[in-house]
C-alpha cells in the first residue's frame, strides 16, 4: 500500500489461545492471545509472543492477561490493547497517516448479543472503522474449501482453545449448531489436575500444554503412531523438591476422557437436531475437524468409531478459521451471512 492508501483491510481469527491476522491474503501475525500490562498505569508493555514469555513469570509491577476465556472476551480493556498491539505488527509500510481499517473477525457461533458487541467495540476502539463478524464454524468451512452456499449439508467441528463450535451449514447459513465451552484449555487444565493428583508434581499451564502436544491422545492404543514418553520436570507439590516424571500417552488419554466425551455428546446433540436430508449429506460427506484440538492424536478415529460417520481433519486445522475470514474479507458484498 502506498502513502495515500485510505483503507487497510485485515481479517482476524481472534482466538482464546492465538490470534491470527491476514492482510493481502497473507498471514502477517500469528501470535499468542496474551498481553502484558503495567499494573500501575494499565499501559501495554508487550503483546503476543513477548507477552507469553512473561506469562506466569511476571513481577509485582506487571500483569500478563489472556483477554479471552472460553472463546469470548473476559477483559475488555486488555483485549482492546492486545488487538491494537497486534494490528500494529501488520507491516503496512510508510504512510502519511493511519488508514481506516475494514475488518472481518471470527466469533463463536454461541456468542450472545452482548459478547458480539464486546468484540465489535474492541475492534472499533483498536482502530476498526468498518467491522464485520463471521461465526467461526462458517469461517472454518470456507477455509477448508467447502462451498457454504451450496444446497447440501456440511458439518464442521472446530475445537479451539476456549470453545468447541459444532455447526451444520447449508445455503450460506447455519442450520443447527452447538457451542460448548469445553476445548483445548480444558484439556490443558485436565492435565494439570491429573499431574498434581496422580504424580504429586505441580506443572504450569505452559508445561501442561507441552505435555498435551508431546503425548496428548484421545485413544489408549495408537499402534505405530504412539509417541515416546515425555519427561515432566517440576516441584513436588508437598515437599517442593524437584521431580522428574515420565508420562506416557495412555495415561494422558485416560485423563482427557471426560472432556472428550463431552465433545462427543455435543456432536451427537447437533446431529439429532439436523434435518434428515442434510443428515444424509453429512453421512455421505463426512464431518470436518478444524482448530488446534483436531490435532489431538487419534481423535478422528475415536469419533469415527463412536459416531459411525467418517471424520476428516482439515488440511491445516490451525489456520482454517483464519483462511476463511480472509476469503470472507474479499467477499463482504457477496456473503450475506456476515454480521455488521
Regions found by a protein language model. Give the residues of each.
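Nucleotide/phosphate-binding catalytic cleft detector across ATP-hydrolyzing
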Residues: 1-159, 167-287, 294-340
Amino acid at each position: 500500500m502506498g502513502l495515500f492508501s485510505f483503507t487497510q483491510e485485515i481479517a482476524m481469527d481472534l482466538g482464546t489461545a492465538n490470534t491470527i491476522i491476514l492482510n493481502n491474503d497473507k498471514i502477517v501475525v500469528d501470535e499468542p492471545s496474551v498481553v502484558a500490562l503495567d499494573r500501575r498505569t494499565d499501559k501495554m508493555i508487550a503483546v503476543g509472543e513477548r507477552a507469553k514469555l512473561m506469562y506466569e513469570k511476571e513481577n509485582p509491577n506487571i500483569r500478563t492477561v489472556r483477554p479471552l476465556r472460553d472463546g469470548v472476551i473476559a477483559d475488555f480493556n486488555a483485549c482492546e490493547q492486545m488487538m491494537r498491539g497486534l494490528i500494529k505488527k501488520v507491516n503496512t509500510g510508510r504512510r502519511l497517516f493511519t488508514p481506516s481499517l475494514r475488518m472481518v473477525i471470527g466469533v463463536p457461533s454461541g456468542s450472545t448479543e452482548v459478547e458480539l458487541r464486546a468484540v465489535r467495540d474492541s475492534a472499533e476502539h483498536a482502530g476498526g472503522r468498518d467491522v464485520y463478524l463471521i461465526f467461526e464454524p462458517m469461517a472454518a468451512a470456507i477455509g477448508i474449501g467447502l462451498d457454504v452456499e451450496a444446497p447440501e449439508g456440511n458439518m464442521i467441528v472446530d475445537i479451539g482453545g476456549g470453545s468447541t463450535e459444532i455447526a451444520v451449514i447449508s445455503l450460506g447459513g447455519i442450520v443447527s449448531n452447538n457451542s460448548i465451552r469445553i476445548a483445548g484449555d480444558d484439556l490443558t487444565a485436565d492435565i494439570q489436575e491429573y499431574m498434581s493428583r496422580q504424580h504429586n508434581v505441580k506443572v504450569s499451564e505452559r508445561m501442561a500444554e507441552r505435555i498435551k502436544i508431546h503425548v496428548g491422545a484421545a485413544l489408549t492404543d495408537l499402534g505405530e503412531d504412539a509417541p515416546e514418553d515425555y519427561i515432566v520436570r517440576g516441584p513436588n507439590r508437598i515437599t517442593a523438591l524437584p521431580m522428574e516424571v515420565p508420562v506416557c500417552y495412555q495415561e494422558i488419554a485416560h485423563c482427557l476422557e471426560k472432556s472428550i466425551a463431552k465433545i462427543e455428546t455435543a456432536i451427537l446433540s447437533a446431529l439429532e437436531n439436523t434435518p434428515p436430508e442434510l443428515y444424509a449429506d453429512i453421512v455421505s460427506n463426512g464431518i470436518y475437524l478444524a482448530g488446534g484440538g483436531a490435532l489431538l492424536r487419534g481423535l478422528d478415529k475415536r469419533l469415527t468409531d463412536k459416531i459411525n460417520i467418517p471424520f476428516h481433519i482439515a488440511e491445516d486445522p490451525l489456520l482454517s478459521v483464519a483462511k476463511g475470514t480472509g476469503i470472507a474479507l474479499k467477499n463482504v458484498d457477496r456473503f450475506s451471512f456476515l454480521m455488521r
